[in-house]
Amino acid sequence: DNSKKIVSNFNDDRIKYFYSDTKLSLYDARNKAINETSGELIAFLDVDDWWDKNYIFSRASLFNDDDKDFFYCNRFTFYEKNKKLKIFRKLDLPNGKIYNYLAKDYFISISGLIIKKKIFDQVGMFNKDFNIIGDFDLVMRMAKTFNGHAINEPLLFYRDHKNNFSKKNLGMFFNEFDKWFNNQVKLGNN
C-alpha cells in the first residue's frame, strides 16, 4: 500500500512509520509497533478503513481524564459493492466498565479505538495465537478492568468488501472464538 508515502506527507516527527523486513502476523506486528511508540496513547487504523477529519480532536479534551482509560467511537460501514454508508449503532454506546455490554453484543472496531498505553502493562499485549479475534480478545480484557468512554458520533469509516480477511476465513474465526470462549469458561469468566 501507500502508507509510507502518505505518512511522509505529514512532515511531523510525532508520526512514526515502521516497516518490517520479515512478514509478521497481524498481532505480532501490532505488538512490535506498540513497543516502538513513545507516546501515551495508542490508536489503530487498518489499511482499508479511514477516520473522519475530527477523529482525534473530538476526544482530545478527554485524554487527560484519569477516569477514562480507552476511547471508542461509533462507525459508518462503507459497503464497497454498492458504495453505500450505514451507521453501525443507532443506540447510545455505553461508558465505564463495558464488559457485560460487549459480552452480549460486541460493537467496538479496533480502528475506532484509542487506548492509554499504560493499559498494556496490566492486560498484556495482543495474543499472537489469534489471527482474527485478537482485537476482540484485547478489548474484552481491557473492558473487565478499565473504563471506556464512548463517542456516539460515527468518526470511523469501516470498509466492508469481499476481501475482508475475517469474511474469507469464517472457519478460522469460529475456531478462534471457540478457543477463546472455552478458555473463559476454564478461567470462570462466563
Question: Language-model features: where?
Answer:
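Conserved donor NDP-sugar-binding/catalytic core segment of glycosyltransferases
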Residues: 54-86
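Glycine-rich, basic loop-to-helix element that forms the pyrophosphate-binding segment
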Residues: 20-37
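Short aromatic/hydrophobic "clamp" motif used to bind/position activated sugar donors
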Residues: 42
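Acidic donor-binding segment of Leloir-type glycosyltransferases
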Residues: 1-19
